[in-house]
Curated annotation (Swiss-Prot):
Cross-referenced PANTHER family: MATURASE K (PTHR34811:SF1)
A single GO molecular function term of this UniProt record: RNA binding
Pfam families: Intron_maturas2 (PF01348), MatK_N (PF01824)
InterPro entries hit by this protein: Domain_X, Maturase_MatK, Maturase_MatK_N
Family: Belongs to the intron maturase 2 family. MatK subfamily.
Protein name, UniProt field: Maturase K
UniProt KW keywords: Chloroplast, mRNA processing, Plastid, RNA-binding, tRNA processing
GO CC list: chloroplast
Superkingdom per UniProt: Eukaryota
Main localisation: plastid
GO biological process: mRNA processing; RNA splicing; tRNA processing
Source organism per UniProt: Clematis florida
Function in brief: Usually encoded in the trnK tRNA gene intron. Probably assists in splicing its own and other chloroplast group II introns.
Location(s), subcellular: Plastid, Chloroplast
Length: 509
């Protein structure tokens, strides 16, 4: 970021926030290429254009000019290939422009984050919180004291124009916003945000993934901003007498005028949502709101969120996108795990002088299991088994060497074991490993034109032993003198703080 500040002359850019001229700066596209994007088209050899392996600002300028034209000329050369200067190639155009736009549109947010005093106080030792697994110890500590949850699928905007309007509060450069709006109109389908089922994060095209990821994250940030503000303010409210409580009968009518009377009745409205035991967590397009409150309070939260999305942000919110469930009899489908809080009965023997008593108590226990059915569906989509869970061979890998095939299957198996190490019941995970083991054997047998049984007999019992090694054996290497402890540890949940992305097979489900 320091290198970027030197390029942009931060003091001058803060005064006016002019972003449009940055589109014509060569280092912007160099930064876009160097910051982990896919290989840029601007660096691809363009023999058709007569250019070397480098980007050209002439291309960018002509693409921007063409975006404002009503008609596009298509000029073909002798080999019937469209001329990329004047031809209408939407994929090329959108990728070339979006690479620069994606970097530029992030600048106001990145610079404010770097210059904010809060960012300087961040402890580097807290980097482990980036791990996906770090959220589960938090859930284990908090959910035991709560009763109800709201399973929320964050809605999507009806039109991307709403995102552009929201960006106006952060970006004051009118020409850049106009170009951004025109770019979205011309080169992207507005219905791309209307996703199938619940997958909101998978609609991004591979070419423009960074650009749309930014728009999506900004969309989620704005939708959560007022909710987080209300939540923080409710902590500072003192206990109020019942006369400040709005009439429940007219609650749903009054909530419609929430933003009209926001300033006048702010503390009164906050009293409705005052709940010191509420917890909120989110990953991608799914969020969970848990509370110790009554079902009536959860209904109020649901109605409030729906009205907030529809009336303030103009998001298309369907009633079935928010479900109210009780923690004691409901699984939370989150981050590839099925989590629940189950009451576990136990008997405690109490001795008082000469008499003894047996007391029955119920202890809440946080439980996480592997969702076997979605995982089998993911394996079926990846062609490792059918949808009934019967292992099949992987013909696409049959041309590889034996060691390469074993390494591929082993990598998948180790990643699954690593990601689902926090499961309290390993039976489902063993079944997934069995499917992968037999699929690997079938693939090798197919390659050598043999049966699976004869192939396994020829290799012996040590077949695939290395890449199917259990965590119990790994722990025995780390703790050789306390093997009993390592075996017990393997039966318990293990959370790793080096997992920063969700498992690919979990994303397929």
């Amino acid at each position: 970021m320091e290198e970027l500040q030197g390029y942009l002359k931060i003091d001058r850019s803060r005064e006016r926030d002019f972003l449009y001229p940055l589109l014509f700066q060569e280092y912007i596209y160099a930064l876009a290429h160097d910051h982990g994007l896919n290989k840029s088209i601007l660096y691809e050899p363009m023999e058709n254009l007569g250019y070397d392996k480098k980007y050209s600002l002439i291309i960018v300028k002509r693409l921007i000019t063409r975006m404002y034209q009503q008609k596009h000329l298509i000029i073909f050369t002798n080999d019937s290939n469209p001329n990329f200067f004047f031809g209408h190639n939407k994929n090329l155009d959108s990728q070339m422009i979006s690479e620069g736009v994606a970097v530029i549109v992030e600048l106001p947010f990145s610079l404010r984050l770097v210059s904010s005093p809060e960012s300087k106080e961040i402890d580097k030792s807290m980097t482990t919180l980036r791990s996906i697994h770090s959220i589960f110890p938090f859930l284990e500590d908090k959910l035991l004291h709560l009763n109800h949850v709201l399973d929320i699928l964050i809605p999507y905007p009806i039109h991307l124009e709403l995102l552009v309007q929201t960006l106006r509060s952060w970006i004051q450069d009118a020409p850049f916003l106009h170009l951004l709006r025109f770019f979205l109109y011309k080169y992207h389908n507005w219905n791309s945000l209307i996703t199938q089922k619940t997958k909101m994060i998978l609609f991004f095209s591979k070419e423009n993934q960074r650009f749309f990821l930014f728009l999506y994250n900004f969309h989620v940030y704005e939708s959560e901003s007022i909710f987080v503000f209300l939540r923080k303010q409710s902590y500072h409210l003192r206990s109020t007498s019942s006369r400040a409580f709005l009439d429940r009968t007219h609650f749903y009518r009054k909530i419609e005028h929430f933003f009209v009377d926001f300033r006048n009745d702010f503390h009164t409205i906050l009293w409705l949502f005052k709940d010191p035991f509420i917890q909120y967590f989110r990953f991608q397009g799914k969020s969970i709101l848990s509370s110790k409150g009554t079902p009536l309070l959860m209904k109020k939260w649901k109605y409030y969120l729906v009205n907030l999305w529809e009336c303030h942000f103009y998001f298309w919110s369907q009633p079935d996108r928010i479900h109210i469930n009780q923690l004691s009899n409901h699984f939370i489908d989150f981050l590839g795990y099925l989590s629940s809080v189950r009451p576990t009965p136990s008997a405690v023997r109490s001795q008082m002088l000469e008499k003894s008593f047996i007391i029955d108590i119920v202890i809440k226990k946080f439980d996480t299991i592997v969702p076997i059915i979605p995982l089998i569906g993911s394996l079926a989509k990846a062609k490792f088994c059918n949808f009934s869970g019967h292992p099949i061979s992987k013909p696409a890998w049959a041309d590889s060497s034996d060691s390469d095939i074993i390494d591929r299957f082993g990598r998948i198996c180790r990643n699954l074991s690593h990601y689902y190490s926090g499961s309290s019941k390993k039976k489902s995970l063993y079944r997934i490993k069995y499917i992968l083991r037999l699929s690997c054997a079938r693939t090798l047998a197919r390659k050598h034109k043999s049966t699976v049984r004869s192939f396994l007999k020829r290799l012996g019992s040590e077949f695939l032993e290395e890449f199917l090694m259990e965590e119990e054996q790994v722990l025995s290497f780390i703790l050789p003198r306390i093997s009993y402890f390592s075996k017990r540890l393997y039966k318990e949940r293990i959370w790793y703080f080096d997992i920063i992305r969700i498992n690919d097979l979990t994303n397929l489900s």
